[in-house]
Amino acid sequence: MLEFASLGAFQNHVTQTMIPAVHSHLGRGLEAAAELIQNTARAKLGHYQSSVEHFPAWPELADYTKADRVAKGFTENDPLLRTGALRDSIGHEVHGFEAVIGSTSDVAVFQELGTNKIPPRPFLGPAVVQNEEALRALWHDVLLRGFLGRGSASTTQMTGARLRDGD
């Protein structure tokens, strides 16, 4: 057990040891959370989705869309999945304590929000909502380990998110 000669010594310990450890764990936790949401969003493409909170269920593809898919050599009824380009455009970036999960494709915006001709088929928003419990557990683990100064267990897995020692 650590003992401190003064409150100043304790403050130095917190400043030099605990705060950097918490920051390190937060960064790794944010990376794991972003990866979890990214992977969930990617997995939605090609499968009809039911409604999630305020996000609507995906409607059936229009007959002309199905015919166009078949004419171009794709399967008839795998919504938002043809070549995999949209799926592969979904990624994430983490900088400090900020994460961005999204797509580099303009098509993603049209599909997520819909247009006057295309009904919304959201996949990014629902990916966050559907992972709420896993994200809570992840953040609990990250904060607890950071405050206690413990490393992350290499086997910690939460539905695809993983914290690894040394990351």
Task: Please state what every model-predicted region is.
Residues 1-167:
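Short, Lys/Arg-rich flexible segments
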